[in-house]
Amino acid sequence: MPKVRQRRRKVKACKMCEMNVEYVDYKDIRILKDFLNEKGKILPRRLTGNCAKHQRMVKIAIKRARQMALLPYIKY
C-alpha cells in the first residue's frame, strides 16, 4: 500500500498584528477589499492569515461597511 503524503500548510503571519493595528475601521475600504474575494465574500482565516481577534474585527467592519453602502454585498 503506498504511503500518503500529508501537506503541511504554511502558517501565515497576521498582517494586522505586524502593523500593530488595534482597530479595523469600516470606513477604510482599501484595507477591507483585501479580505474579500472577487465575488465580494469574506475570505477565511486560513487564506488571509489573520489571527482570530483581527478576523473578527475585519468581519464586523465589512458588515458595517456593507450596511452603510460603502461595500457591495455581492459582485456580479
UniProtKB/Swiss-Prot annotation:
Extract the Pfam families matched here.
Answer: Ribosomal_S18
Q: Which GO terms describe its biological process?
A: translation
Q: Which UniProt keywords apply?
A: Ribonucleoprotein, Ribosomal protein, RNA-binding, rRNA-binding
Question: Where are the membrane-spanning stretches?
Answer: none
What cellular component terms from Gene Ontology apply here? Answer: cytosolic small ribosomal subunit
GO MF annotations in UniProt: small ribosomal subunit rRNA binding; structural constituent of ribosome
**InterPro entries annotated for this entry?**
Ribosomal_bS18, Ribosomal_bS18_CS, Ribosomal_bS18_sf
Q: Does the keyword Chaperone apply?
A: no
Reply yes or no: does the keyword Mitochondrion apply: no
What the protein does? Binds as a heterodimer with protein bS6 to the central domain of the 16S rRNA, where it helps stabilize the platform of the 30S subunit.
Q: Which family does it belong to?
A: Belongs to the bacterial ribosomal protein bS18 family.
Subunit structure, briefly?
Answer: Part of the 30S ribosomal subunit. Forms a tight heterodimer with protein bS6.
Q: What is this protein called?
A: Small ribosomal subunit protein bS18
